[in-house]
Amino acid sequence: ILEDSLKELENRTLGRPVGERLMILGSENDDHEFINMVESCGSTFVIDDHCTGTRYFWDEVSLNGGDPLTAIAERYVNRIACPSKDWPVRTRVPHILSLAKEWDASGAVILQQKFCDPHELDIPAIKSSLEEAGLTTLFLELDVTVPTGQFKTRVEAFLEIMEEEGLF
């Protein structure tokens, strides 16, 4: 079944224009309505960096003939860090820049859960690093639920800016 699914994925198409290739960043976002709204405006999320998204699962456990429990512990300790643990060596910003390049993202939507101080403190470094790398960014702050209707206008303006930047 897995092999059949993998073959099917190779030939799969999106069924609509891709539009702007975006990445979505933040502590978490399980609001499919928000994602659908952004993509309905003419874009596609190609990668995420969330605590419970790809960051949690990034990198494999490397046994290298060693003890499995030690290998799991090393992967846990050395994985891309949550902002609250990303000190003294910062791993998250280089990881995000690598994702943007690898997935050919042209913009980033940064979702900030209100009162999540570690993520909030990371935003200036992430935003400036992405912009220096040529990505357009949109910062949206939310309080528990995503106000999809309120954010739609901002998302549309963001995508218009990206479209205009592509003209020059």
Q: Model-found features: residue ranges?
A:
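A charged, amphipathic alpha-helical module
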Residues: 1-58, 85
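A short, acidic, amphipathic alpha-helical segment used as a generic capping/interface helix at domain edges
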Residues: 87-104, 121-122
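Peripheral docking tails and interdomain loops at the edges
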Residues: 124-168
